[in-house]
């Protein structure tokens, strides 16, 4: 069992190893941070080995997607807000995303994590605030 766990950790670390940045990101992160809304999806051009495989397989520059959930005060439901606090120990004013990462599961991360990455906003057309909160609730329930 320990050998299998060791091998699994090694493979995960190998696949998730990120290459250094080779160029300046193509987006204005400050503008994106201002314009993004809860339930927007951010497409990310990843730099890991698994990202390279995904980009090759899908014939797309995007290898990762994250769900923007806003700041803690943007979450209407107090139970969901508490669950996010259980998974994220940073500042309550931080802009947050939910993402799934190989070897980590579904986690809460600061939007600022992607400041130097090539990212784009993907926004559902005409989504209501209630629908956006439902999408966020669905993602929050899957943390862990």
Question: What spans do the regions from the language model cover?
Answer:
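Cysteine-nucleophile amide-bond enzymes
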Residues: 1-144
């Amino acid at each position: 069992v320990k050998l299998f766990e060791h091998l699994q950790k090694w493979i995960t670390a190998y696949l998730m190893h990120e290459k250094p940045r080779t160029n300046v990101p193509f987006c204005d992160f400050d503008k994106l941070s201002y314009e993004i809304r809860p339930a927007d999806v951010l497409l990310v051009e990843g730099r890991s080995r698994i990202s390279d495989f995904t980009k090759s397989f899908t014939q797309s520059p995007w290898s990762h997607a994250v769900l923007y959930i806003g700041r803690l005060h943007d979450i209407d439901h107090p139970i969901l807000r508490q669950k996010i606090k259980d998974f994220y120990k940073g500042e309550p004013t931080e802009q947050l995303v939910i993402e799934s990462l190989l070897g980590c599961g579904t986690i809460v991360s600061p939007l600022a994590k992607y400041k130097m990455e090539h990212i784009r906003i993907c926004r559902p057309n005409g989504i209501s605030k209630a629908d956006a909160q439902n999408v966020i609730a669905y993602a929050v329930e899957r943390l862990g």
